[in-house]
């Protein structure tokens, strides 16, 4: 998979941003590092990539949080917690070339109710995957989007987070992890002959 462009609207501290991974210094890079001061948005960028690809983030992965409590009317593990305070809508769109060589666009979005007693409350989020090649399909059902992500990226959510996007503190967890799980991840990355 090759990430081409990331567009962020009203996610956490980022009001609006477009990151072009094909232009400038990033255009030829096979690997890149996201760095900056504490609070500068590094983790938010990673959250946005996984949100577009998988409809969830490592930070708010519901399967990791037991007995989640509500915060501000949303479950603690609800990705809508990332919506910028006071925003009426939020979205993340990721353009990429999948492992199958096809161009895709993955979008996660949410809007707020515009009137009535629930005005300002966030609606259920939408998640869409689109094959941007000629005659390509668009998927809007969660299961179909999960299958499109698996096809294009080559990893399911947890594998992706453990390999391509080791969030804060997770590198040590990978190094100390189960040998079979590490072998499976490495096999997918570089092939059985090299593992």
Model-derived features: positions:
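Short, small/polar-rich loop/turn modules that mediate ligand/substrate recognition or access, typified
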Residues: 167
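Cytochrome P450
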Residues: 174-179
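Conserved beta-strand/loop subsegment of P-loop NTPase cores
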Residues: 164
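Extreme N-terminal "head/tail" segments of very large remodeling/mechanoenzyme assemblies
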Residues: 1-143, 147, 157-161
């Amino acid at each position: 998979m090759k990430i081409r462009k990331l567009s962020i609207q009203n996610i956490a501290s980022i009001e609006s941003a477009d990151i072009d991974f094909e232009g400038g210094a990033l255009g030829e890079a096979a690997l890149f590092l996201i760095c900056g001061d504490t609070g500068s948005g590094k983790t938010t960028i990673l959250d946005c990539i996984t949100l577009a690809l998988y409809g969830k983030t490592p930070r708010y992965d519901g399967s990791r949080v037991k007995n989640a409590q509500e915060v501000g009317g949303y479950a603690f593990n609800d990705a809508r917690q990332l919506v910028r305070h006071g925003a009426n809508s939020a979205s993340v769109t990721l353009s990429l070339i999948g492992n199958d060589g096809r161009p895709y666009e993955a979008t996660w979005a949410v809007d707020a109710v515009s009137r009535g007693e629930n005005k300002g409350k966030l609606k259920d989020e939408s998640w869409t995957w689109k094959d941007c090649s000629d005659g390509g399909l668009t998927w809007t059902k969660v299961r179909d989007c999960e299958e499109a992500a698996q096809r294009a990226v080559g990893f399911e959510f947890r594998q992706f987070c453990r390999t391509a996007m080791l969030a804060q503190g997770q590198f040590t967890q990978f190094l100390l992890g189960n040998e079979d799980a590490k072998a499976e991840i490495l096999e997918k990355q570089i092939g059985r002959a090299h593992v």
